[in-house]
From Swiss-Prot:
It is an enzyme of class 3 (hydrolase). Its EC number is 3.4.21.88. The lineage of its organism: Bacteria, Pseudomonadati, Verrucomicrobiota, Opitutia, Opitutales. This is LexA repressor. The keyword Repressor applies.
Amino acid sequence: MLTEKQEAILDYIRSVQAQRGVPPSTREIQRHFGYESQNAAMNHLRALARKGQLHQVDGATWGLKVSEVQGHFELPIYGTIPAGVPSMQEQQPKETITFDPAVFRLRRPERLWGLEVHGDSMIDAHILDGDIAVLERREAKPGDIVAALVDETTTTLKRLAYVKGKPVLKPENARYALIVPKDRLEIQGVFVGLIGRAKR
């Protein structure tokens, strides 16, 4: 069983390794968690290795076990999605990226897909222009951020809300207005994570 700190370190290693393809160095872990020396980080890494969670890549780097790395899969990216004014959704996958669902504690990767964000209507939710929104095909709840098809013509990424019992799409930027569907709103995916590509 892992301690809370060990879980945090393992999650950080997963995140970095998923984004870069290589795990962080011991010094990077030290800086990220604010340790005064590398020894504190090393103690946690050795403990994780004893528990079968990590293996030592070289003298300064500890990575995920091969079995966990092999859990990565190709996340389909279905074109672009506007985070400002809605526009037509592209139907064919634009690209695929190697993705580790364990980063977001997800167990059903076959339900996942991604869309690239364009615009600034979700900046208060820290979703920026150029990021990849990771979405899961499942039922949405009020308050979820969703990819939604509006009136069978336009797709956008917004927060789902209800006004007088009717669904609306709420931006996370005060400069944008609510989107109120005239006829139909189809939830295409629920936002479950972000792969940051934009500069922060």
